[in-house]
């Protein structure tokens, strides 16, 4: 087959214009390979400008690139390795391994631009996805094949929560996880990789990184690379896959940079006019089909804490559940620091989770909400000024608050406490006993950092016998 060869005619930062022979223009989203100075630069066709010229976005550095250099049309989009051979490896946006462990034994190579599953193939996300983490399973349950937004500032435990989820799906469900670092700090990616190696989770995980120092084209496409690898496990192997994207805001930010470089007129707050379309193209591919499911957990940075900013606001429309991590809760020493009143889930509905789960979850939230309202009175006047009924609510709320904490497997080395995976039925039973007053005689410290309610009983009875 004869190669379709063009020549570089203009370079503006990461944007490269290439002229091809008349009638031989490569299609939009095709990968173009540019060979110069012993390097290969891959760019992606973004626009047809007329005069047989295409405008491409480079996925690597254009340093040293000159006009007149040959550019070869590969005839299709970027293709990345998929299959079991990708597990335990680290890739860049082009699907090239960056962990110095040699070639990848790929089952196949798939293009990163693919259509979302058709309407007939999709299955609505109404089945609960058990994470083994009490606060999530009870108050903001994840849907199998759903999309979850993880909101939180620096140092409240986003990465630890992500690692625990990866560990739980690997050991309890035997499933695979794909972690995609989009515009991430390289140091954080390195920490994650080292911690995964230590905890043994790496064998069931694929890591894909497009860091902060990469050109915007790479940061914009790296999420699609990770998603394509996840789609293989869903569509061919019929697996339930977990896809982590950290951070979805950086994906939008990279799209905004590329949009400006391509000369598009910016929209609200300077974002790209194609914002909703770009986010939709990614999110619509993350779904359950008749074969398997992709459940995605997406860390979301909120610029200036403004939830009405177009980036988080557009992402919200796609989410099924939100897990909000709170600094106030972390300061109390309660981990995971999930805010039980701010976190929400679309499937916390009696028709999906059942009457008992719904009743227990809502009662727990009512008690915590009432405790929050009473805190000002307690701070000023003390506990003695409360009515007996309110005192009881405060005592139960403090037990609930502590019982929402849980020792994590991935944090064993730091806490010295063995991790706990709590089944959903045990979670519901435990909180039901607290709200029904069956645990009123047990002091609150026994509820801190335990798994099931049976552990609370055991520890209390052991101490009583000791006395």
Curated annotation (Swiss-Prot):
Short name of one Pfam family: ATP-synt_ab
A GO cellular-component term linked to this record: plasma membrane
Amino-acid positions noted as binding ATP in the UniProt annotation, renumbered to this chain: 152-159
UniProt keyword annotation of Zinc present: no
Keywords: ATP synthesis, ATP-binding, Cell membrane, CF(1), Hydrogen ion transport, Ion transport, Membrane, Nucleotide-binding, Translocase, Transport
InterPro entries (alphabetical): AAA+_ATPase (IPR003593), ATP-synt_VA_C (IPR055190), ATP_synth_F1_bsu (IPR005722), ATPase_a/bsu_AS (IPR020003), ATPase_alpha/beta_chains (IPR050053), ATPase_F1/V1/A1_a/bsu_N (IPR004100), ATPase_F1/V1/A1_a/bsu_N_sf (IPR036121), ATPase_F1/V1/A1_a/bsu_nucl-bd (IPR000194)
Keyword Membrane: yes
Name assigned to this protein: ATP synthase subunit beta
């Amino acid at each position: 087959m004869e190669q379709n060869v063009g020549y570089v005619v203009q370079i503006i930062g990461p944007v490269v214009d290439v002229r091809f022979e008349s009638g031989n223009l490569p299609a939009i989203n095709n990968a173009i390979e540019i060979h110069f100075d012993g390097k290969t630069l891959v760019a992606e066709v973004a626009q047809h400008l007329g005069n047989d010229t295409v405008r491409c976005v480079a996925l690597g550095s254009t340093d040293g690139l000159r006009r007149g250099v040959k550019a070869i049309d590969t005839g299709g989009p970027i293709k990345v390795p998929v299959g079991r051979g990708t597990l335990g490896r680290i890739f860049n946006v082009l699907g090239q391994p960056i962990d110095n462990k040699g070639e990848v034994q790929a089952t196949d190579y798939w293009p990163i631009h693919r259509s979302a599953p058709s309407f007939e193939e999709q299955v609505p996300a109404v089945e609960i996805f058990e994470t083994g983490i009490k606060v999530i399973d009870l108050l903001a349950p994840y849907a199998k094949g759903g999309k979850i937004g993880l909101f939180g500032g620096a140092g409240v435990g986003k990465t630890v929560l992500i690692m625990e989820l990866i560990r739980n799906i690997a050991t309890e469900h035997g499933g695979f996880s794909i972690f995609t670092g989009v515009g991430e700090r390289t140091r954080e990616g390195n920490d994650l990789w080292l911690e995964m190696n230590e905890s043994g989770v790496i064998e069931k995980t694929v890591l894909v990184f497009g860091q902060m120092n990469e050109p915007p084209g790479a940061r914009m496409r790296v999420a699609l690379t990770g998603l394509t690898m996840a789609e293989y496990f869903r569509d061919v192997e019929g697996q339930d896959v977990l896809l982590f994207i950290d951070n979805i805001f950086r994906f939008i930010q990279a799209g905004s940079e590329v949009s400006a470089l391509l000369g598009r007129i910016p929209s609200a707050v300077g974002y790209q006019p194609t914002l909703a379309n770009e986010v939709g193209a990614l999110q619509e591919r993350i779904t359950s089909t008749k074969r398997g499911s992709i459940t995605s957990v997406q860390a979301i940075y909120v610029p200036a804490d403004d939830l009405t900013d177009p980036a988080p606001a557009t992402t919200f429309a796609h989410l099924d559940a939100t897990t909000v991590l709170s600094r106030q809760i972390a300061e109390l020493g309660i981990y995971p620091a999930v805010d039980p009143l701010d976190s929400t889930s679309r499937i916390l509905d009696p028709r999906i989770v059942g009457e008992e789960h719904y009743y227990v979850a809502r009662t727990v939230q009512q008690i915590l909400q009432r405790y929050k309202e009473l805190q000002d009175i307690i701070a000023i006047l003390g506990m003695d000024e409360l009515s007996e009924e309110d005192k009881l609510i405060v005592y139960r709320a403090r037990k609930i608050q502590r019982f929402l904490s849980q020792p994590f497997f991935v944090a064993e080395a730091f806490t010295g406490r063995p991790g706990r995976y709590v089944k959903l039925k045990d979670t519901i039973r435990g909180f039901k006993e607290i709200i029904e007053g069956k645990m009123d005689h047990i002091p609150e410290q026994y509820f801190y950092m335990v798994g099931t309610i049976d552990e609370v009983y055991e520890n209390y009875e052991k101490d009583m016998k000791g006395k």
